[in-house]
Amino acid sequence: YSSAASDVYKRQLLDNDKLDIDGLERLIERLIKGGVHGLFILGTTGEAQSISYRLRHEMIKETCRINAGRLPVLVCISDTSIVESIHLAHVGAECGASAVVSAPPYYFAPGQPELAEFYEDLIPQLPLPIFLYNMPSHTKVNFAPATIQRIARNPQVVGFKDSSANAVYFQSVMYVMKDRQDFAMLVGPEEITAECVLLGGHGGINGGANMFPELYVDLYHAAVARDMETVSRLQPLVMQISSSIYTVGQHGSSYLKGLKCALSLLGVCDDFVAAPFHRFNVPEREKIRKALEALPFCPELKP
């Protein structure tokens, strides 16, 4: 995974417990055609914590079926229950996933010693390699660099995804992990992916790639090649998407709603958002339409 730029894709729903399989297939094919290096499911953008375990299992099975071994599939197994995390990992392994991804248990916030002990208990029970996943805004827990270093003594820990949006923290983790040349360092926020790759990171898991995978893949390759002219040309487009499509409504759900609405307008999938949220109404949808139309590469949109 150390040379991969993995791009996340959203879970597709028709209602709170029904998967939009046609939309999922269109999205996976769009991502593969766009050149992404991997598929990451059941993460934040995938609304995993809002759906049933039955639907999570179906999502894993359908993704692996549609992908048919073309790209590595990373399955997020984050949960408050270690038993359910292990179960999700085994479903992933049975379906042909390449690795699992795990954020800390949330609700009861563990201290750093407890966090390390949790993973030292979890990892030997997993059938696949694991990426640690830092998402402090949602879990209220932040992996200390020393904790990552301790957990990653186990070679089954193959990488780290950081969604803290803190580039200094990301560099701190890179520094303590410098002796693990096989350890992949991935970043979540697309706004700083190029920066992190230029400073030695290995890629990004970016929600915006659901809409325009070529943009994020091209930016990744430009950063790897130290092609600053291309980075300087593409980075403002990433920021244009971030500042327009993800900010409509100014709510905690604005990112999810904006991305799903955009995918609907692009003809990829339905814009249903799992409870407690709801899809954008007409005024917000029109704002997303205008934001898409303002992009220089926007195709014809759906009504």
Regions inferred by a protein language model and the residue ranges of each:
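Structural preference for beta-strand elements that scaffold enzyme active sites
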Residues: 6-7, 37-38, 72-74, 98-101, ...
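A general structural signal for well-ordered alpha-helical segments in protein cores
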Residues: 24, 56, 60, 85, ...
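Catalytic alpha/beta core domains of metabolic enzymes, predominantly
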Residues: 124-125, 138-242
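Single conserved hydrophobic/aromatic residue that forms the stacking wall/gate
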Residues: 1-5, 9
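Active-site beta->alpha loop and helix N-cap motifs at the rims of alpha/beta catalytic domains
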Residues: 13-142
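Structured C-terminal cap/extension of enzyme domains
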Residues: 33, 194-303
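Active-site-adjacent beta-strand anchor residues
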Residues: 75-78, 163, 186-187, 206, ...
